[in-house]
């Protein structure tokens, strides 16, 4: 049984098997319109720029934001202002100074600073001061329920099965993007080590 045909004149049909691939083709040329660093994954796009002065950084980002706005208009897409914001990255001392306030505008509105001074990019929480305590806290909270599940079944399933479950449920989360945040403070690393030791103890004593 086949559904009836329906023309799709704008955008990409959602729920289709080829939808993700078609969408990537649809936005493929966006990065070529920009003259700053641009990272894309699915429908998320991150632009970044740096220079010797905040004024120059603001100018570069504002110009590229306008290019994005024009590209979206040409492709009949609409920007969501609530999901579009900026984050200023630097040392804690620099961020506290007045010089850290960079004004970037796009499509007639001023981009607001990220809430909590952090952004989650592909599952990694990046803080504006480039510390990782927030990400480590997120990892710890994510693993709490998983560890509780392993604890309940530790005497029910065989050792090899429990080992496989722990590697899939816990280790995969611990090592995800580890080279990126592996240089965090020692106290944060100890928190992760405690989790790893706890799971290892559950598995070996099963």
Predicted features and spans:
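Short, conserved non-catalytic motifs in the polymerase core
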Residues: 1-22, 48-54, 109, 113, ...
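Basic, alpha-helical interaction scaffolds
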Residues: 109-182
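Mobile genetic element proteins and their domesticated derivatives, centered on retroelements
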Residues: 15, 19, 23, 30, ...
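Catalytic palm subdomain of template-directed nucleic-acid polymerases
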Residues: 11-12, 28, 46-73, 91, ...
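Short, conserved micro-motifs composed of acidic
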Residues: 63, 77-117
């Amino acid at each position: 049984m086949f559904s009836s045909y329906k023309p799709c004149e704008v955008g990409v049909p959602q729920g289709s098997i080829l939808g993700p691939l078609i969408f990537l083709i649809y936005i493929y040329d966006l990065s070529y319109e920009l003259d700053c660093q641009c990272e894309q994954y699915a429908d998320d796009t991150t632009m970044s720029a740096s220079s010797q002065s905040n004024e120059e950084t603001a100018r570069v980002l504002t110009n590229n934001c306008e290019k994005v706005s024009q590209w979206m208009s040409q492709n009949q897409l609409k920007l969501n202002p609530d999901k579009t914001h900026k984050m200023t990255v630097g040392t804690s001392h620099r961020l506290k100074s007045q010089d850290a306030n960079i004004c970037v505008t796009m499509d007639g509105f001023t981009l607001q600073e990220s809430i909590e001074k952090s952004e989650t990019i592909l599952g990694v929480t990046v803080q504006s001061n480039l510390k990782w305590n927030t990400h480590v806290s997120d990892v710890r909270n994510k693993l709490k329920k998983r560890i509780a599940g392993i604890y309940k079944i530790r005497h029910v399933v065989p050792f090899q099965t429990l080992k496989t479950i722990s590697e899939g449920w816990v280790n995969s989360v611990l090592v995800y993007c580890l080279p990126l945040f592996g240089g965090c403070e020692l106290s944060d690393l100890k928190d992760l080590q405690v989790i790893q030791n706890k799971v290892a103890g559950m598995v070996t004593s099963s």
